Structures are given as structure tokens and as C-alpha cells.
Amino acid sequence: AKHFCAYGPVTAGREYASVDISERTLLEVHLPSFAAAIAAGVAAVMPAFTDLAGIPMTANAALLRTRLRGQLGFEGVIVSDYNSIGELIRHGVAADLSEAAALALKAGVDIDMMAGAYRRGLPGALARGLVSMALIDESVRRVLRLKERLGLFEDPYRRGAVGESDAVLGRRRTLARSVAARAIVMLKNAADTLPLPGSVRRLAVIGPLADAPAQMRGPWWAAAEEHGHVSVVAGLVGALPDCEVMHAPGVSIQQDEPDGMAAALRACEAAEAIVLCVGEAAVMSGEAASRAHLGLPGRQRELAEAVCGRAKALGKPVIAVLFCGRPLIVPWLIERADAVLVAWFLGSEAGNAIADVLIGTVSPSARTPISWPRAMGQVPIFYAQRPGGRPANASDPYTSKYLDEANEPLFAFGHGLSYGRFALSNLRVTPHEVRARDTIEVRVDVVNQGRRTAQETVFLFAHDTLASVARPVLELKGWGRIELAPGQRGTVTLRLPATQFCFVGADLTAVFEPGEVEILVGPCAQRSQLLCASVQLS
């Protein structure tokens, strides 16, 4: 499990930068996922590169020893991130490798990844009395226990590289295609632009990411081969054998190259529909890839505006496919395109998976795992905010608002369309009176009012209306998924232990307080789309 802990909320959104958050945020937001991983039996934990309130995580004994091992009960191995022990010198908390090694070891770090600090620094630390042999033995025992569990004493090379048959590789490609298709989020589908009609005979696939198989790998592809990745163009050519697929990149992602805009617009004129593939290069996401501007890089906006303008004049639909590792702030494109898919970086079968969704072989079923911002000034934006004493109120100027933008995200957490059309009704919650040892059952009816079989995701949120500390307006407590044919009805049932209503009290310990809790169920975190019932905690 990594990276422990609070690796995300860095200063100015720059990776590796300092973190300074409240104890409450640490307890409520960042530690629970590690507690769950430990309960599931995770074998190793990696500390973050960052410091938290001035203490580098690699040397943070209070969090690694007291919290992680002592309070959360972690008994496995702690392994440093790449060179992070040596980087304690740059943090300014160690003068040399011996001091750095001593700080990390005393914090509970068992394995030094690539810094050479333990190999070169621990002998000096031991000689200077900075660490004891007993402390070294403690970490050695944890490492040896893990090796024993993995069977490495009997077979040091187990699970080494082995060849795979064509049949096994084929099954892996099939799985990769299915997983990729299920990861595509449809943000917009005006006038049922998608799926593409089976009668389409000329299709323009425009943009620098339309025929870019290597970009489909995304960041951190490690040992992935250069060949064998399917681009959008290749996927559509394979899926539509009777359709002429015309490709024009238009512009590059970053560099100023010879202008292909005219060729792209000619392709639009000749086509019945346009698939516009824009977004980030793979290297713009992942580690050490923070961006200050979250629009389309390079001249892609110029291309997209030209394509959308020409298509509108010609009366032809534009389907925008966004490739990105983060939400891109492109409200102008969302407005002007007829349909919008978020394809992230889908891997080796990306092009085939995108084609499956575009032609309707697969109904999109993924949902946004974040709140999608309208503007940079909204970041960070999330659904679990506290109400504050002056929540937004259009009739009162002295409330929490922007002068130049709406408070709400462009798309709420959990947003995502499909080729079905779903309606939720008849929310039931039992029991109404809930004690700490109870489990509540939440049931909601779902009907597919559309013309295609599709999946709907149902989210379960809670809101504690009155408590000893201000509670978030929404907290995610569970989710379920159901597949329904046209006209079919079904029921989603979710069960929730009442202990899920515990929260961090004013004294920073867990409390279960009596009172009313709202149970909210719906397709996303937009309050207006949620059905609501309530239970009484006692």
C-alpha cells in the first residue's frame, strides 16, 4: 500500500512538495484506506516522498511506528520510495547518509530502495551510536519473515519471467479490451449522437491522439512493448470494415509542426461524422507530471474549435474523445461537441475498446471518480465539503460563492451516461431506529426506460444533519450496479453496518452520536438527483 500518508494534498499541486493538513483531515480522509488495506492483509507499506508538517514521511516515527504499526496494527515490511532515505539530506533533517539511515531505521523503515543509505550509512550510524544492533535486527527479522512467507528461501527465483502461450496472451488481450471499455466515461450524448449508426460509411478521425498507439499505454508502462497497442484509427478500421476511416492529426500535442489544420477540415467535410481525439500526452500524467494549466496542451484547442465550427456549419456530429490522467478543464469543448467520452489511458486494447463503445457493441458504464471542475479556481473541488456558516445563497450576497463562476462542478462525482435511460424510485431503509451494532438495509427500484441494455450505478451517501462537529454535506458509504434490458425493472440492495456512522469527534476520537442521519441514493453526487430517506441513530 502506498504512499503513506497524505501524499496527495501537496502545496500548489506540485508532486513531492510539502503537505500541511489538520489532524482531523488525516484521521478522516487519509488513514482509513490504509486501515482497510491492513485489515485485508497487505504485506508492505511505502512512505511518501513528502514531508507532513515539516517531518519527512520516511523519517516520521510518529506516523510509521506509533500510528501505522502501533494503532493500525501493521506487522509487515515498510519499504522506502526510490532514494527517499538519501533525500532526507535534501529535506534538511540529516547531514549525511549515516544520519539519514538512522532516522529512517528509527522511524521503522525496513528496506532502503536504491539510496544505498543502509549499505553505506548504517555502519557509520552504528559506530556513532545513532542506532543499535537490536534496531537493525528488528527490521531484518521483518524482511526475513516476508521472504519466508513468499517461499523465497526454497526458491529464490520463483515467479520469474516465463513465456506465455498464444492462447494465454489472447485471453489477456480479451480481458484488457473488456476492462478498457468498462473504464470509458460518457460525459455527454446530446440527441443520442452515440452509438454511431450502422449505416455510417465515411468517418473522420481527427487529432494528434487519433493514431498514437504508444500514447495509449499511459505513464508507468514499465516493460510494455513498443508494438501491439491499438490506436483509435486502427480500432475503428477493424470495427467498421464497410466504412472509410479518414485520419488527419491536424496538430501535434506539444510541438509546433507543419500545419495540418486544412487537411483535418477537408476530412470533416468529406465525412458523415467526426471523432475528435485530443488530450494529454502520456508523459503529462503520472509521477512528476504536475500541470499548472489544465486545458488542452499545444494548439489542440485551436484545432478543436475549428473542427467543431466547421462541423456545425455542415450539420455533422462531433464526438470528442479525451485522453488524460486528470480532469481537463474544457467546458467550451463539452458545450460544442455533440458527445464526449473520457478515455483516460486505456492500455494495449484502447482503440478496440473505444470503437466498441462508439459503435454500441458495449454500452459505457464507467463513472467519474472525481468531481470535474469548471475552472482552475475551483480546485480542489469535492463533494464531501462541510456546509460552513454561510453556504451559497443566490439571494444573499454575503455567502460562499464565486463572483465569476458557479460553485458546483461541471460534472459531479459519479457522473456517467450509458445507452440506457434509468429512473430510480421507491427508496426504502430499514430499520428506522438504528443502534451501533445494527446493519441497515437500503433498497431502491431501478427501471431502464431506454432502448438498449445497459448498466446503472447506484451510489449510497449519508449526511449527519446535527452533530458535535460540522459534518460533510455528503459522505459516500457504498455503491451497487445493476444491468437491465429495455423496460426491465430491478432492485438494488445495499447493506451498511451502523458503525459506518461513527465519525471523528471534537476530541479526535471515534464517536457514535444519536440523532438523524439522511440516507441519499442516486446516480451521482448531485443533490438534486438523489432520493432521500432518514434514520434515527440511538
Predicted regions and their residues:
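Short beta-strand elements
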Residues: R527-S538
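Glycoside hydrolase catalytic-domain context in secreted enzymes
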Residues: A1-G505, E513-R527
